UniProtKB/Swiss-Prot annotation:
GO terms for biological process: L-leucine biosynthetic process. Signal peptide: none annotated. Catalyzes the condensation of the acetyl group of acetyl-CoA with 3-methyl-2-oxobutanoate (2-ketoisovalerate) to form 3-carboxy-3-hydroxy-4-methylpentanoate (2-isopropylmalate). Its main location: cytoplasm. CDD domains: DRE_TIM_IPMS (cd07940). Pfam families: HCS_D2 (PF22617), HMGL-like (PF00682), LeuA_dimer (PF08502). Residues 4-268 form the Pyruvate carboxyltransferase domain. This is 2-isopropylmalate synthase. InterPro entries: 2-IPM_HCS-like (IPR050073), 2-isopropylmalate_synth_dimer (IPR013709), AIPM/Hcit_synth_CS (IPR002034), Aldolase_TIM (IPR013785), LeuA/HCS_post-cat (IPR054691), LeuA_allosteric_dom_sf (IPR036230), LeuA_bact_synth (IPR005671), PYR_CT (IPR000891). It comes from Thermotoga maritima (strain ATCC 43589 / DSM 3109 / JCM 10099 / NBRC 100826 / MSB8). PANTHER family: 2-ISOPROPYLMALATE SYNTHASE 1, CHLOROPLASTIC-RELATED, HOMOCITRATE SYNTHASE-RELATED. The keyword Transmembrane helix does not apply. Pathway: Amino-acid biosynthesis; L-leucine biosynthesis; L-leucine from 3-methyl-2-oxobutanoate: step 1/4.
Length: 513
């Protein structure tokens, strides 16, 4: 069987999903999970784009051991320099730069305003420049699927001659159909000189719902690497979903003689961790990881499954790490049991972070009798999301009733600074949001608000995921508590903290600017 490399770009392209931004700590934890999952390459970010992106790439590069860590760069010298600075401490065979430039007529005319020869010269110059610092260089011709094939062949030929070790073919706007994309890969495989000496990669977007199909067509026509994201998250309609591509190869190995290094039993835990970190919940009918995948409501289907599961299921829940055993720990469970349970889901924490998780676990175990798997995911992601210098909810009080005007008072703290405010609203949640706005002097617009139960039974925690629009940018927040008003306030503050940190409005030593 031919081995297909899995290039995961959840931390870079996936993070470009509106509201899916991750803190540095969250990126590191997600990268460790991706390493356990078995991906071959992790694209950690775009180092030149911001100090936070630079530091995230650097931290991921120092945290993981096995995968190749990749930094993105335009065909611009400062981009390549930044990628090198972020990755220079990593062994040469474990670091890669991914340089790109657009090649399609529409990009040449309207975005780059360059002629073909200028683009070829940039490829030659900057792939060669990157090669001075990196043994492994991937070159992408952005919008390749809408580029004239003869020019595309020339672009990839130029990149290989300049030292590229991987050429990547992006279907940047998800425009291609599987048969034509497969034919394009075949044409490149046959027509680009030197292509037999490099990896041939594809990066498919899902605008027409064909990202996975196009990636499969590419592999069937000679691609050796596929670029993916967990849960298919990414720009616009997203990217080729890791879990779908990998499980198609596993389930249909009778027709698809390809394999990957993915440990499929960690797919569901990885998906759940990403959901808790980003707040982006896969639709219930999402293939592989959706909540409905192994549920059967029709009487005929239920009868068939009870008699033999394979009548209506083509894979087992255990194939992707889903288990019906959800009850895990209680108030008498110790650190060893907690750490062991987390490790079964591929979650590895340093001692300081684990201690914070254990403290929150014991607090929760005192408040509810039974602690479930989803409770643990919530605790871990809550700890990872806590900005070191962000505002925290110290105290709140809500006064409400069906004959009263709901009011809320809050006390927020960052460093040694406290802010207090009270406001009325259309219900207790609206009142506490308005009180937070007043305390911080910010006027966000609530774009999305979702509440769901974590665990089962009357003691279940409420998990709130929301998205705020501030300065015309989206920031996601998440909060968990047995009190849904408190969970809502935590989520709201979490999103605002992301905004304040992104804009440099929180001092490093605590306190707001």
């Amino acid at each position: 069987m031919r081995r297909i490399k899995i290039f995961d770009t959840t931390l870079r392209d996936g993070e470009q999903s509106p509201g899916a931004s991750m803190s540095i700590e969250e990126k590191v934890e997600m990268a460790l999970m991706l390493e356990d999952l078995g991906v071959d390459l992790i694209e950690a970010g775009f180092p030149v784009s911001s100090p936070v992106q630079f530091e995230a790439v650097k931290r991921v590069a120092s945290a993981v051991q096995k995968p190749i860590v990749v930094g993105l760069a335009r065909c611009v010298e400062k981009d390549i320099d930044a990628a090198y600075e972020a990755l220079k401490d990593r062994p040469k065979d474990k670091r890669m730069i991914h340089v790109f430039i657009a090649t399609s007529p529409i990009h040449r005319k309207y975005k780059l305003r360059m002629e073909k020869e200028e683009i070829l010269e940039r490829i030659r110059r900057y792939v060669g420049y990157a090669k001075q610092f990196f043994d492994l260089v991937e070159f992408s011709a952005e919008d390749a699927s809408r580029t004239e094939v003869p020019f595309l062949i020339e672009a990839y030929k130029t990149a290989i001659e300049a030292g590229a070790t991987t050429i990547n073919v992006p279907d940047t706007v998800g425009y291609a159909l599987p048969d034509e994309f497969g034919e394009l890969i075949k044409t490149l495989r046959e027509g680009v000189p030197g292509i037999e000496n490099v990896d041939l990669s594809v990066h498919c977007h899902n605008d027409l719902g064909l990202a996975v199909a196009n990636s499969l067509a590419a592999v069937q026509n000679g691609a050796t690497q596929v670029e993916v994201t967990l849960n298919g998250i990414g720009e616009r309609a997203g990217n080729c979903a890791l879990e779908e591509f990998v499980m198609i190869l596993k389930v249909r190995k009778d027709k698809l003689p390809y394999e990957t290094g993915i440990k499929t039993e960690l797919i569901y835990p990885a998906s759940r961790l990403l959901t808790h970190i980003t707040g982006l919940i896969p639709s219930r009918n999402k293939p592989i990881v959706g909540e409905n995948v192994f549920l059967h409501e029709s009487g005929i289907h239920q009868d068939g499954v009870l008699k033999h599961r394979e009548t209506y299921e083509i894979m087992k829940p255990s194939d992707i790490g889903r288990s019906s055993e959800t009850l895990v720990l209680g108030r008498h469970s110790g650190k060893h049991a907690l750490r062991k349970k987390l490790e079964t889901y591929g979650i590895k924490l340093d001692e300081e972070t684990f201690q914070k998780v254990f403290e929150k676990f014991t607090e929760l175990a005192d408040r509810k009798k039974e602690v479930y798997d989803d409770d643990l995911f919530s605790i871990v992601s809550e700890v990872l999301r806590e900005p070191i210098n962000g505002y925290k909810l110290v105290h709140f009080h809500v006064h409400t009733g069906n004959t009263l005007l709901p009011t809320a008072a809050v006390v927020l703290q960052v460093g040694n600074e406290k802010r207090e405010a009270a406001e009325a609203g259309n219900g207790p949640v609206d009142a506490i949001f308005k009180a937070i706005d007043k305390a911080l002097g910010i006027q966000p617009k609530l774009e999305e608000y979702i509440i769901q139960a974590v665990g089962t039974g009357k003691n279940a925690q409420g998990e709130v995921k929301l998205t705020l629009r501030i300065d015309n940018e989206l920031y996601s927040g998440r909060g968990v508590s047995t009190d849904i008003v408190e969970a809502s306030a935590i989520a709201y503050i979490n999103a605002i903290n992301k905004y304040l940190i992104a804009k440099g409005l929180l001092r490093k030593n605590g306190g707001a600017e």
